[in-house]
């Protein structure tokens, strides 16, 4: 029996994205399921599903991440591994941090 395109989408694996600080309130959860080949694709997918979170992550509806938002992949800042365009897989751990200030 051939597999339809719809059936093949059921096998796409998702990964867990952890949210911190005020981003949790925007998404109304501390953890989201996301899918995509790159960090950027995942961020756009979760932003499409959670509009308030998308507004907090991206400036004026653009694809530019707001300053001071930190994306960590397996404990490393995404800026150290090539920004938002490196490939990620289901075994990678992604965490998103809002700006943090202290004093």
Where are these regions (language model features)?
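Ubiquitin-like/PB1-type beta-grasp interaction modules and other compact soluble beta-rich domains
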Residues: 2-102
């Amino acid at each position: 029996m051939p597999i339809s395109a719809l059936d093949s989408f059921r096998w796409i694996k998702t990964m867990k994205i952890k949210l911190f600080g005020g981003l949790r309130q925007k998404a109304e959860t501390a953890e989201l399921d996301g899918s995509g080949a790159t960090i950027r694709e995942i961020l756009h997918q979760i932003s499409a599903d959670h509009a308030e979170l998308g507004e907090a992550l991206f400036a004026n509806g653009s694809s530019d991440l707001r300053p001071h938002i930190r994306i960590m992949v397996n404990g490393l800042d995404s800026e150290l591994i090539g920004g938002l365009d490196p490939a990620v897989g289901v075994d990678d751990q992604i965490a998103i941090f809002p700006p943090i200030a202290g004093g």
